Amino acid sequence: MSLFGTSPEDSSAGNSAHRSKSSLFADEPSLGTGSNANLGSSSLFADDDDLSSGSPWNSNVNKRTARHKLVKTLLSDSDAPESYIDAYDLVLSAGDRVGAGIGLTSVREILSGSGISASDQEKILNIVVSGDIDSANGLGRGEFNVLLALVGLAQEGEDLTLDAVDDRRKKLPAPKSLYLDALRANQESGTPAPSQERPITPPRPASPQQAPNSAHSRRESMTGLESDPWGSPELHRGHAHAQLESDHPVLNGYGSVRSATNAWSSRVGEDNNPNEISNSNRANSQTDSAPSHGSGFGWGESLGNTPSDGGLGGTARAGLGGFGPPSSVHSDSNPRRRSLGIGRVASPPVEEHVTVTLLPEKEGMFMFQHRNYEVKSARRGSTVVRRYSDFVWLLDCLQKRYPFRQLPLLPPKRLSADSNAFLEKRRRGLVRFTNALVRHPVLSQEQLVIMFLTVPTELSVWRKQATISVQDEFTGRDLPPDLEDSLPSTLPDTFETVRGGVKRSAEIYINLCTLLERLAKRNEGLAADHLRFSLALQSLTEVTRDTYAIDTNDVPLLNEGIRATANHLSVSQSLLEDEARAWEEGVLEDLKRQRDCLVSVREMFDRRDRYARNNIPQLERRIENNERKLQDLRSRPQGTVKPGEIEKVEDAIIKDKESIVQQHARGVFIKECIRDEIVYFQQSQYHISRLHQEWSQERVKYAELQADNWRSLSDQVESMPLSG
């Protein structure tokens, strides 16, 4: 007997008779062979008829997976004609991008504009789009080539099978589609490509809770920057960047470097600058912000207070346990826009934004090729090309120089063959990494980061020419006399409390990201099934007159209602696909940003355990031994002590005491640094609030659009005949 009930053998024997019965609603597939199989049952609703074998290796899922792989590899770029390749690039540039491929909306437009019958459209869709297999990544070049080949075969009256495509491999047909012709005409005339048809119903009156301003759609924000979901705002050109003082030592190439602690002042000064942008262009503009150059020290300076006020300066917020920035600093945001005109509840100041675009061409010798990324900063007015290894080198340098800072995370490196889905995920990870750097008040002022974002030459060449410093940020700094007393005595307990909460929260957010990815993929699969349903209904209208041939008077009204249902299913498919895309580019990236933030804080505490150690107790014991030895040497009769031995012991004592002072000062600096990082991390809670507000508004908008779509269908099918 099994731990969870009847064993598989007993269950199979006990249910064999039940499986052999012919049931009208026998939806369950046959799992047996011979007498135990219901192969002979004429089940009207047995949808999984492919499961004709009891072997688990012959399941329907495995067959679909195998066919999907065949479709992807049947027509490679070398086999496809140039017209197929140009058509794919044309559709991709039109903006209907899902993952690294094209979406179902473009597939529907190509099929509907080809002039083939609805039944042929349905058959082609079922061949090319294999249900939930990789649906979230769109159609790649391989699937698109097969799609065009099947459309061409249908227009020539050939069989619609993969074998027919393979037989015509050397002479593939040239399909005709009004949609592709329109895209080509727009490209030749230089006019913008027509946006994909999104069924937009008349908006409802805005409720009092909604914000007065509404953002543009995500797709509109993507088209200007090669469909990058992190589209950089077009900032003003006259931005005056902060000038670095020339009396500081030159580090990391050229220019002068302010101390890491003073860098907080200029950064927070920018964030606190009043935002005087109108609501209409708030998401696409930037205000000039002059960094403050006060004479204060450390975090206190960044808050506009002197260290004499103690701690972080001024009156601390009660919610931060005696240290924290004023409320004006809490508006750190990422003003990304939601699709389909979702309004924002609040309009925080626009911050610097960096876009990362994957370049299509590989570089390097065979077997050692690599991908390049275009890194563009609108505020800095810079565009550079970097490799993934350049990002790795930058993070390695920052870990050596700023081990006790909240360093952003890099996406992992993949050694196996690159896939479009992986490359797109890594590109988005690089976007999060780069923008986390430019948001950080200290790391954004580091010369390595500035040079990484602005040096136009190849980074490996610049590294050979520049003088790069990766010394610990506390090296050479003197401890201010009042800094140690200004730190709260409960700081260690606060560190442990925050560390425990961050560890648990990071695990939860990792799980949330996985769940939301699954939800988005399910939405993509649901959209594909809606399109299949729509094409099946359209093909049904072709045979309705023959089906009811005795009296065809009501057939036109019947077909009109069926076509209305098919059209509204197509509208629903577009909405589902657009919503899934909005999730992947919006709330999913927001969750991943918060996840990366939590994991980076967790790793900061782990690095503190490894690198914040000292040997002060050992030095104190050694000083005591040397002092006793020195007294013994001085008490000896003159002439019995070797020359220079007393001076040697004295020098050892002095060096040990200096080392104790330096290590103690470093420990204080580490406490202050981690305290500052926790205060900076405190702002992420407001990002969580915006995340939930924007996602809820987005869900409401799509729910209203779907409801309006089905309400319109209900009105249109009222005229369908109900009786003779």
Curated annotation (Swiss-Prot):
GO cellular component, one term: endosome
Residues where a 1,2-diacyl-sn-glycero-3-phospho-(1D-myo-inositol-3-phosphate) binds: R387, S389, K413, R426
Gly residues compositional bias, start-end: 310-324
Domain remark text: The PX domain binds phosphatidylinositol 3-phosphate which is necessary for peripheral membrane localization.
CDD domains per UniProt: BAR_SNX8, PX_SNX8_Mvp1p_like
Location of the PX domain: 351-459
Protein name: Sorting nexin mvp1
The keyword Heme is annotated on this UniProt entry: no
Function noted in UniProt: Required for vacuolar protein sorting.
Topological type in the membrane: Peripheral membrane protein
One of the protein's GO biological processes: retrograde transport, endosome to Golgi
InterPro entries registered for this protein in UniProt: AH/BAR_dom_sf, PX_dom, PX_dom_sf, SNX8/Mvp1, SNX8/Mvp1_PX, Snx8_BAR_dom
Top-level taxon of origin: Eukaryota
Source organism: Aspergillus oryzae (strain ATCC 42149 / RIB 40) (Yellow koji mold)
Family assignment from sequence similarity: Belongs to the sorting nexin family.
Record Pfam families: PX, Snx8_BAR_dom
Subcellular location: Cytoplasm; Membrane
The entry's keywords: Cytoplasm, Membrane, Protein transport, Transport
Listed GO MF terms: phosphatidylinositol-3-phosphate binding
Chain positions covered by the region annotation Disordered: 1-39, 176-242, 265-342
